[in-house]
Amino acid sequence: PYYSDVADYSLSIGVPSRFTVACSGSPEKTVIDGERTKYSYTLKNGRDFAMVLSDKFCVSAVKSGKTDIFYYSAEKDENTEKILAEIKSCFEYFGSSFGEYPYKTFSVVETEFILGGMEYSGLCYVAENQAPEEKLYAALHETAHQWWGITVGNDQINEAFLDEGLAEFSVYLYLDSSGKN
């Protein structure tokens, strides 16, 4: 748990070209130099900046308005596409209900996270070892945090209910509005 103000981030990272980078920021520049690739990213008004590197990622993407939504997983299957479609749908619901999403990209990354997920500015983790329906719910909950806890910040130590409660309630509102609750 933490409390953080917003800041502007600029990051450049060089990695072996076989690696894929998933991170909070928007890609600004990519330079391939032999066996290495250098990526540059920016993030305006972020509460934090997170990234995940892997040489095993399969990447799926959709567009929602001005935002590119990415889903990174170790394998692409029918559940991946269902989860991504549902993320896009809830993303649009949250945007119309709670206000415009502030970043150019949003990435959901399956990781070896212990359980559930974790939100960061423009990116969230979901545990890859969950059943598909649990993974989906975690992704929806962490997507809601892009509005509650990220865009609208709070003291996550002394007022944790604010973002957790609003994120959870937002998922229920979305599921109810789409007839899935």
Where are the language model's segments positioned?
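Hydrophobic helix-coil surface modules that form long, contiguous segments used
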Residues: 2-140, 169
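Zinc-dependent metallopeptidase catalytic helix centered on the HExxH motif
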Residues: 124-181
